[in-house]
């Protein structure tokens, strides 16, 4: 059995096989997931697991160089945005790099998810709690 925090085999495999610049999306319970992209559905019930819990566990396993966030989160969900940006700042310190943050429209965000290796659906039930994480290299 693994001794790191991430126990979900499907998600662990996905992160382990990410190449440089490939992406993984973490989303709320409502984001449409294209049929062409692998779905890793962690949602159990409303709020479980939360977007931020899932982000924390994933970023403990994944080296992140860039993220994409929907612009609408600034107005519709500033609390999650603040917590997300705080987690990214901590991740920068831990990784020793600067993470590029890009805001795009929600429609553009949904198009970008088509390129993700997988989309991780959480139980989060708050608007625009979604992020696309782009894999970097730790050397």
From Swiss-Prot:
Keywords from the named record: Carbohydrate metabolism, Cytoplasm, Isomerase
Entry EC no(s): 5.4.99.62
Gene Ontology MF terms in the entry: D-ribose pyranase activity; intramolecular lyase activity; intramolecular transferase activity; monosaccharide binding
Pathway(s) served: Carbohydrate metabolism; D-ribose degradation; D-ribose 5-phosphate from beta-D-ribopyranose: step 1/2
Cellular location(s): Cytoplasm
Domain of life: Bacteria
Family: Belongs to the RbsD / FucU family. RbsD subfamily.
NCBIfam families: PRK11797.1
Full protein name: D-ribose pyranase
The species this protein was found in: Haemophilus influenzae (strain ATCC 51907 / DSM 11121 / KW20 / Rd)
């Amino acid at each position: 059995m693994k001794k790191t925090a991430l126990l979900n085999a499907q998600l662990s495999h996905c992160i382990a096989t990410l190449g440089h610049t490939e992406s993984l999306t973490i989303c709320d319970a409502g984001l449409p997931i294209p049929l062409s992209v692998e779905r890793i559905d962690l949602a159990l019930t409303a709020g479980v697991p939360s977007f931020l819990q899932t982000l924390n566990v994933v970023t403990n396993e994944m080296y992140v160089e860039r993220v994409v966030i929907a612009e609408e989160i600034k107005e519709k969900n500033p609390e999650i945005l603040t917590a997300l940006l705080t987690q990214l700042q901590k991740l920068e310190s831990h990784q020793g790099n600067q993470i590029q943050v890009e805001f795009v429209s929600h429609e553009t965000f949904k198009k970008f998810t088509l390129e993700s290796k997988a989309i991780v659906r959480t139980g989060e039930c708050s608007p625009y709690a979604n992020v696309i994480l782009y894999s970097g290299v730790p050397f």
